[in-house]
């Protein structure tokens, strides 16, 4: 056991985590040169296209150190985006140490900080690594100072490497073996294994990634899931080198995969403890804290026949993504679908793309909303995650919106722009600290503004230099209203949105204008209105298409023309009473962009 090292690689987006993982795999000979490809651990197509890591991946490698010993390295490549920080915290729970990778050109960024604090809270050994030293813009001395100044860990002898060229990567491994402690645990005690992650394989059923904390797991053992009490047979187990390799046993301290022929998706939840049925452990390992979704949106299949397969797809995805929340929802405009909870807008986009790609579904998404706390006049407190669930205005005593605490790191030059943006988003400044030419800003901004497009706008006002980390702080009373959209005097529930009263006029007007361009013209006038309660705040009309009934007259008497026009008018009137308006899918997507600057 003393030769096992479990560690994660944590860093801000694009600081070179996945490339460093590639080099480590190459040096330890996990894959032959022929099988080696860039970002070998980003196995999803989506990850490769966007160049980001979404799922944490684990690998077991053997490394022969300079002291002549051979060490077994179990390492986990983690995502850098703020939306996937729960993936990072789950990976860290399986480790004794973490490599904090910092780009020697960019320096410390917000996510570097957030991930590092997560690691420190879990009492992990953090080893700083300065990456990309081959860049002309690299300034390792300055960045080492920044790490000490902002993060507060000793970085005087931080390892310098370039993952792209491979310089210094062996030093990283040597330092790792030296500084990260071996796993603690009792190899002879009762089995306790923590489920770090799981996914669904069409042939094998549920595959789980486990970290053995105590005891040993052997092939063919009877294994019990502690939360449900069900027992399964350990059919196959093994490690990733990144290829799946079968083993006969997983020893104490190792990280590996396990197949128990679990067909039920909820059979082995992530964060649960596995133990042996013969000699069970007394208590379960502390799991992970449940992540609360921050953004909710309705997802509806375009054709209602897909509802069943959509439900199965969500089930399989939620197994792989523990933070995805969903419940059935029906809408008069869109039929049956699900209300889903996500951690942020990127997470929502990724889930939607994965559903469309991996499960061949066509989906319509409604506007994302956050959870509001509503105190009714009957003094009840309810939580509302969809505009259609909001009680009528006169039943609401107080409406509270979630406030996010946003930590931003940015160069001084962009401070003015960023502060202007935060004020525009109804933010309140709580802290500002200067570190060299970097500024650390803390603002409290309503969550609804953060999830809409704050991140994109922050990046564009600071030319990509500012970085952001946010978390939920509290609920705060606020003057929010629901804006309804009426088409021909009928409310369309899927188009409603909740917004602050100050912005409601402009949002309503903008929405109505957008809808006017998107709804195809019919044979009769279509009135589109935005309303708060019964008060109409904006209106526009999609003009009717009409045939020129006078074309056949050629001159002729005025009364003849009047008769024809009158007849047409009556026909249109009848049509309007019975006519239905078909809303195109673009109309629903239009709301997603309301309130965003059309840059």
UniProtKB/Swiss-Prot annotation:
<keyword id="KW-0472">Membrane</keyword>
<feature type="domain" description="tr-type G">
    <location>
        <begin position="2"/>
        <end position="184"/>
    </location>
</feature>
<dbReference type="Pfam" id="PF00009">
    <property type="entry name" value="GTP_EFTU"/>
</dbReference>
<dbReference type="GO" id="GO:0005525">
    <property type="term" value="F:GTP binding"/>
</dbReference>
<dbReference type="InterPro" id="IPR013842">
    <property type="entry name" value="LepA_CTD"/>
</dbReference>
<dbReference type="InterPro" id="IPR031157">
    <property type="entry name" value="G_TR_CS"/>
</dbReference>
<comment type="function">
    <text>Required for accurate and efficient protein synthesis under certain stress conditions. May act as a fidelity factor of the translation reaction, by catalyzing a one-codon backward translocation of tRNAs on improperly translocated ribosomes. Back-translocation proceeds from a post-translocation (POST) complex to a pre-translocation (PRE) complex, thus giving elongation factor G a second chance to translocate the tRNAs correctly. Binds to ribosomes in a GTP-dependent manner.</text>
</comment>
<dbReference type="InterPro" id="IPR000795">
    <property type="entry name" value="T_Tr_GTP-bd_dom"/>
</dbReference>
<dbReference type="InterPro" id="IPR038363">
    <property type="entry name" value="LepA_C_sf"/>
</dbReference>
<dbReference type="GO" id="GO:0097216">
    <property type="term" value="F:guanosine tetraphosphate binding"/>
</dbReference>
<feature type="binding site">
    <location>
        <begin position="131"/>
        <end position="134"/>
    </location>
    <ligand>
        <name>GTP</name>
    </ligand>
</feature>
<dbReference type="Pfam" id="PF03144">
    <property type="entry name" value="GTP_EFTU_D2"/>
</dbReference>
<dbReference type="InterPro" id="IPR004161">
    <property type="entry name" value="EFTu-like_2"/>
</dbReference>
<dbReference type="GO" id="GO:0003746">
    <property type="term" value="F:translation elongation factor activity"/>
</dbReference>
<dbReference type="InterPro" id="IPR005225">
    <property type="entry name" value="Small_GTP-bd"/>
</dbReference>
<feature type="binding site">
    <location>
        <begin position="14"/>
        <end position="19"/>
    </location>
    <ligand>
        <name>GTP</name>
    </ligand>
</feature>
<keyword id="KW-1003">Cell membrane</keyword>
<keyword id="KW-0547">Nucleotide-binding</keyword>
<dbReference type="Pfam" id="PF06421">
    <property type="entry name" value="LepA_C"/>
</dbReference>
<dbReference type="GO" id="GO:0005886">
    <property type="term" value="C:plasma membrane"/>
</dbReference>
<dbReference type="GO" id="GO:0003924">
    <property type="term" value="F:GTPase activity"/>
</dbReference>
<dbReference type="InterPro" id="IPR027417">
    <property type="entry name" value="P-loop_NTPase"/>
</dbReference>
<protein>
    <recommendedName>
        <fullName>Elongation factor 4</fullName>
        <ecNumber>3.6.5.n1</ecNumber>
    </recommendedName>
</protein>
<dbReference type="InterPro" id="IPR006297">
    <property type="entry name" value="EF-4"/>
</dbReference>
<dbReference type="GO" id="GO:0045727">
    <property type="term" value="P:positive regulation of translation"/>
</dbReference>
<keyword id="KW-0342">GTP-binding</keyword>
<keyword id="KW-0378">Hydrolase</keyword>
<keyword id="KW-0997">Cell inner membrane</keyword>
<dbReference type="InterPro" id="IPR000640">
    <property type="entry name" value="EFG_V-like"/>
</dbReference>
<dbReference type="InterPro" id="IPR035654">
    <property type="entry name" value="LepA_IV"/>
</dbReference>
<keyword id="KW-0648">Protein biosynthesis</keyword>
<dbReference type="InterPro" id="IPR035647">
    <property type="entry name" value="EFG_III/V"/>
</dbReference>
<dbReference type="GO" id="GO:0043022">
    <property type="term" value="F:ribosome binding"/>
</dbReference>
<dbReference type="Pfam" id="PF00679">
    <property type="entry name" value="EFG_C"/>
</dbReference>
<comment type="similarity">
    <text>Belongs to the TRAFAC class translation factor GTPase superfamily. Classic translation factor GTPase family. LepA subfamily.</text>
</comment>
């Amino acid at each position: 056991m003393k030769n096992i090292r479990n560690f994660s690689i944590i860093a801000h987006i694009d600081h070179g985590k996945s490339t460093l993982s590639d080099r480590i795999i190459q040096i330890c000979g996990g894959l032959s040169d022929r099988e080696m490809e860039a970002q070998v651990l980003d196995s999803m197509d989506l990850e490769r296209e966007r160049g980001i890591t979404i799922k944490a991946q684990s690998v077991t490698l053997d490394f022969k150190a300079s002291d002549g010993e051979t060490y077994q390295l179990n390492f986990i490549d983690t995502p850098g985006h703020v939306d996937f920080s729960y993936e990072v915290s789950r990976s860290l729970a399986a480790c004794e140490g973490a490599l904090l990778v910092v780009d020697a050109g960019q320096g410390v960024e917000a996510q570097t900080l957030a991930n590092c604090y997560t690691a420190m809270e879990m009492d992990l050994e953090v080893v700083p690594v300065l990456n990309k030293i081959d860049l002309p813009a690299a300034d390792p001395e300055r960045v080492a100072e920044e790490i000490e100044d902002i993060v507060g860990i000793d970085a005087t002898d931080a390892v310098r490497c370039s993952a792209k060229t491979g310089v210094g990567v062996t030093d990283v491994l040597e330092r790792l073996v030296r500084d990260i402690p071996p796993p603690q645990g009792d190899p002879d005690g009762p089995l306790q294994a923590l489920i770090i992650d799981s996914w669904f394989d069409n042939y094998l059923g549920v595959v789980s990634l486990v970290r053995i904390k105590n005891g040993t797991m052997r092939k063919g053992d009877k294994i019990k899931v502690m939360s449900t009490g069900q027992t399964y047979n350990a059919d196959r187990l093994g490690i990733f080198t990144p290829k799946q390799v079968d083993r006969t046993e997983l020893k104490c301290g190792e990280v590996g995969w396990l197949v128990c022929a679990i067909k039920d998706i909820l059979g082995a939840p992530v964060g649960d403890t596995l133990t042996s049925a013969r000699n069970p452990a007394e208590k379960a390992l502390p799991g992970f804290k449940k992540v609360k979704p921050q953004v909710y949106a309705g997802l509806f299949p375009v054709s209602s026949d897909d509802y069943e397969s959509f439900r199965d797809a969500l089930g399989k995805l939620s197994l792989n993504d523990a933070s995805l929340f969903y419940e059935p929802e029906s809408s008069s405009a869109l039929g049956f679908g699900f209300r889903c909870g996500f951690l942020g807008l990127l997470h929502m986009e990724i889930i939607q793309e994965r559903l469309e790609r991996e499960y061949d579904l066509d989906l319509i998404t409604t506007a994302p909303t956050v959870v509001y706390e509503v105190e009714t006049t009957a003094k009840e407190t309810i939580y509302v995650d969809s505009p259609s669930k909001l009680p009528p205005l006169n039943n609401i005593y107080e409406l509270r919106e979630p406030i996010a605490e946003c930590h931003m790191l940015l160069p001084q030059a962009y401070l003015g722009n960023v502060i202007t943006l935060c004020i525009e988003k109804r933010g309140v400044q709580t802290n500002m600290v200067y570190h060299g030419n970097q500024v650390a800003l803390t603002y409290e901004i309503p969550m609804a503004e953060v999830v809409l497009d704050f991140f994109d706008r922050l990046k564009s006002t600071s030319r990509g230099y500012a970085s952001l980390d946010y978390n939920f702080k509290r609920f705060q009373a606020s003057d929010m209203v629901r804006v309804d959209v009426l088409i021909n005097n009928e409310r369309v529930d899927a188009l409603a949105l909740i917004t602050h009263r100050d912005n409601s006029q402009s949002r309503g007007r903008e929405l109505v204008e957008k809808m006017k361009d998107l709804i195809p013209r019919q044979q009769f006038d279509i009135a589109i209105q935005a309303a708060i309660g019964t008060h109409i705040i904006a209106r526009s009309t999609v003009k009717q298409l009409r045939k020129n009934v006078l074309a056949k007259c050629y001159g002729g008497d005025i009364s003849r023309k009047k008769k024809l026009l009158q007849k047409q008018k009556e026909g249109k009137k009848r049509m309007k009473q019975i006519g239905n308006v078909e809303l195109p899918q673009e109309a629903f997507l239009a709301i997603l962009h309301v309130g965003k600057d059309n840059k």
